[in-house]
Amino acid sequence: MKRLSTKILVLVAALTAAAAVISFAESADFGARGAEGKSGLTVEQMLTYSIQDEYLARAEYELIIGEYGGIRPFTNIMAAEERHIEWVTELFDEYGYALPADTAGRHVVLPEDLKSSFETGVQAEIDNIAMYESFLKQDLPADVRDLFERLQGASENHLRAFRNNLNRYN
């Protein structure tokens, strides 16, 4: 019985740790994870995944800041996410597409500690960069290509910031 209890505790601890690293809920069709592996997307679909991912990052970092305080780089990156949302919104307007509602709050989970928060940031930026790499392989209008390149570059900067902070824990 004691051995079974120990195994159950180990399993619960492992599942908790895994959930902390993957704190962006794994929605089937939302943000970068929703776009993963899809090809032949329209500009509207790509912009939708893009803004969902920006909404998702903002919601996650708001949650982290609310729990752990206004620490960098979360505060800086959350401000950047606001700008990114504005940029994507401008193209929705320009192309006459309906702007998706921000439902990102349904897709985030609070990481258990700051280290897990930085791990979450690292994974989110990796997913975001991969999404834009995929989009940039498409034939895109110049303004959309420019936007995706700027957002990908910003994600590369955010990834560096999260990795630098995560390295303090290792």
Predicted regions span which residues?
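Bacterial N-terminal signal peptides that target proteins for export
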Residues: M1-V10
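Bacterial N-terminal signal peptides
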Residues: V10-A20
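All-alpha RGS (Regulator of G-protein Signaling) helical domain and cognate RGS-like helical scaffolds
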Residues: A28-N170
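Bacterial Sec-dependent signal peptides at the C-terminal "C-region" and cleavage site
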Residues: A20-D29
